[in-house]
């Protein structure tokens, strides 16, 4: 996170490898980055399912992460001003990412539903020129498993999806809508 901040990255989201050292490792990394005083990017993620986890009673690890996310300032989205352009940036964490993070204790909502809800909120409450999604969901040769392509089709109000997770090189951008 400190390196991303040094590179002047404005926003990021979580990926499956953030859970490699369990909840305590992720919480520790977030807290250390925040406490360093160095610039760090905003953390955006709109599809954590806190409601269902809280209904069941948060585990110690879930509470640890909730506290670390709050202290870091994680939000569903942020709005950036780049010159005369206002850009909303939201983040999502996909199903395949979760499948690749066996130590993750969090529950997540469907990325399409969460992104649609967040985009609706952005459009109703913010005056933005563009909506960008940073996604750790990925693309896949199998269209039924290509989460970011499915997201683009389901939520056409998203202008740009910056897709991570699958390490796919695209020679040309994928365009929908």
Predicted regions and their residues:
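Acidic, metal/ion-coordinating pockets
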Residues: 1-177
